[in-house]
């Protein structure tokens, strides 16, 4: 996949809800998976029998599932969200998620040979960048790293360097002004309401109807309903205007 003898940069766009990954010479992400890590709930001594790993001493049960592996078994798993509201909450699980995306999904055999661009939300604390560096340099041993704001990347991919970006993800919403490629930080507006909060509101509405949702797997089920069934209707259409 090299261009002029130079390997493409690997891009990790990790939000609170989904991880998108791919190469800089591709128009769209090659990987888009839920940003989830699941661990088995050992109810009554049961294990997930459908996920077996063949080892030298016979089959082994897989204790941890990552990304899209989680979906078929979410009702049997305790789910972890490594990033919440744009902030890294669980570095160990984020490492597992990135390692899975790089080695299993992008088929990168040796991470030490790659250069990576990681996106993050604006106004994140310095500790967030420090954690990213620790994971990618110390644990994965990548060759080079650039951490860039998601909003700037959104403008650059359109061929412009000035504008206002409204970025509403799963955990947080930002309105970011950018001038000549520079973020005007003191004018950034942040709202800690986004897709995940809409899911939580939908859960409350369903609970009023008598439905019970208690586990993190239930949350993922309601999010699936929101993304695939729920329709957004303009108020003007509802009142016939």
Give the location of each predicted region:
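Conserved phosphate-binding loops in N-terminal lobes of ATP-dependent enzymes
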Residues: 3, 9-10, 14-135, 144, ...
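Conserved, well-structured core segments
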Residues: 117-119, 155-156, 163, 232
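Short acidic, glycine/serine/threonine-rich loops at helix termini
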Residues: 23, 129-131, 157-161, 176-180, ...
């Amino acid at each position: 996949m090299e261009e002029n003898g130079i390997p493409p940069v690997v891009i990790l766009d990790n939000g609170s809800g989904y991880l998108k990954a791919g190469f800089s010479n591709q128009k769209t992400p090659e990987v888009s998976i839920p940003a989830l890590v699941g661990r088995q709930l050992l109810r009554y001594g049961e294990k997930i029998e459908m996920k077996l790993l063949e080892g030298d001493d016979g089959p082994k049960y897989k204790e941890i599932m990552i990304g899209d592996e989680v979906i078929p078994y979410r009702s049997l798993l305790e789910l972890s969200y490594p990033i919440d509201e744009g902030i890294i909450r669980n570095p160990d699980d984020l490492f597992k998620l990135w390692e899975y995306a790089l080695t299993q999904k992008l088929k990168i055999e040796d991470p030490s040979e790659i250069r990576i661009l990681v996106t993050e939300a604006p106004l994140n604390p310095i500790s967030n960048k420090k954690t990213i560096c620790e994971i990618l340099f110390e644990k994965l041993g990548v060759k080079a790293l650039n951490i860039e704001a998601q909003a700037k990347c959104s403008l650059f991919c359109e061929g412009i360097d000035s504008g206002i970006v409204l970025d509403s993800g799963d955990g947080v919403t930002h309105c970011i002004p950018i001038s000549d490629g520079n973020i005007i930080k003191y004018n950034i507006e942040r709202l800690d309401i986004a897709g995940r909060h809409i899911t939580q509101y939908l859960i409350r509405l369903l609970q009023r109807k008598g439905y019970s949702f208690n586990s993190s797997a239930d949350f993922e089920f309601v999010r699936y309903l929101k993304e695939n069934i729920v329709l957004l209707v303009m108020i003007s259409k509802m009142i016939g205007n």
